């Protein structure tokens, strides 16, 4: 689904979305902001590239790092829920992953990402995706 289609649905249903981004460094928010009328459905988001902001701003529990790691389905869900609650939006979206060139501490291969979705009064879920490319291509692909 293209970003314009997402925006059209949000506008039609009068719903709002916020983003919490680690590996994509604000690209999802940027893409949402390119849509005319974005201020009607997108109040903003948080770029939490390292752990400290995930905990202090998004409310991600400390123990989640020890048990699941910073790149995991559970982390993506916690980030999405945290930003949704922080911004009081209907939906929260998050990204966390391994962009490269090094594999990082997660043990996951480069190009592994989790995209989280938190729904007000609904179920929180995350999907794992794989992108093949260099660091920049991986960030854009995940976004």
Task: Locate predicted features.
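Short alpha-helical segments enriched in small residues
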Residues: 1-143
């Amino acid at each position: 689904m293209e970003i314009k289609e997402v925006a059209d649905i949000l506008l039609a249903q009068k719903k709002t979305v916020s983003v919490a981004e680690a590996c994509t460094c604000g690209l999802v928010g940027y893409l949402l902001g390119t849509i005319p009328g974005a201020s009607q459905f997108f109040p903003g988001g948080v770029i939490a590239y390292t752990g400290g902001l995930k905990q202090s701003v998004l409310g991600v529990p400390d123990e989640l790092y020890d048990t699941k790691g910073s790149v995991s389905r559970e982390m993506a869900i916690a980030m999405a829920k945290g930003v949704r609650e922080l911004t009081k939006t209907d939906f929260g979206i998050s990204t966390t992953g391994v962009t490269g060139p090094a594999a990082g501490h997660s043990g996951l291969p480069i190009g592994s990402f989790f995209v989280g979705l938190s729904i007000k009064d609904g179920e929180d879920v995350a999907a794992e995706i794989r992108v093949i490319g260099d660091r920049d291509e991986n960030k854009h692909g995940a976004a």
